[in-house]
Amino acid sequence: MLSKREFLKAVVGLTTLVGTHSSLAKEAAQFPMKRTAIVYYSHSGNTRTVASRISALTAAPVFEIVPQTPYPNAYRPTTKQVREEMQKGYLPPIHAPSINLNDFDVLIIGTPTWWHHIARPVASWLSQTDLSGKVIMPFNTHGGGGLMQTRDDFVQMCPKSTVTQSLTVYGNGDSDLDEQILRWLKEANP
C-alpha cells in the first residue's frame, strides 16, 4: 500500500506527465539516436531511473554494469569501502554488459558520483573497454555535489573518444527530468 506521500508524488507526477506529454513527445521524436547505446551503473537506483528516462526519450538500448560483489546497501559502509578502493586504486571486478560496441557510435554513460568521481564499477568498465573513436555523452547522479570531477574522469579514461558536456542530475531527477534530458540532448548531441 502506498503511503500518503508516495500517493501524492504519484498524482503530481502523473498530472505533470499528462500536461506535458504531447510537447515532450514532439521533442523526443527529434532525438531518435541511431547507433546510440546507454551504459550505466546504479547503486541506489537513481542512475537507473535517469538511464531509463533517457532510453524512453531516445529509443536507445540500455546496458547495465554490475559489480561481481555488490556494494553494501547502507550509505556509510558503502562510502567507506569506496574511499578505501579509491585510495588503493582498486577497480572492482564487474559483470561487463553484453554490448557489441561495433554496433554503436555514441555511448551515453551514466554513473553516480562517488567521492567527487565516477563510480568504481564504471571506472572498471572504462579501464577494460576500448572506446576509441566513440562519442561519449556522460551523465551523473549525485546527492548534492553536482558534477564534481566526473566529466574530467571520462575525459581522462577515454582519451581517444570525444566526450561531450555532461548531464548532472540531483537524486533521480526532479519533476522536470525529461526537460533536463531533452535540453542536454540538444546541447550535447554530436
Task: Please provide the spans of the model-predicted regions.
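Boundary at the C-terminal end of the N-terminal hydrophobic targeting segment
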Residues: 25-27
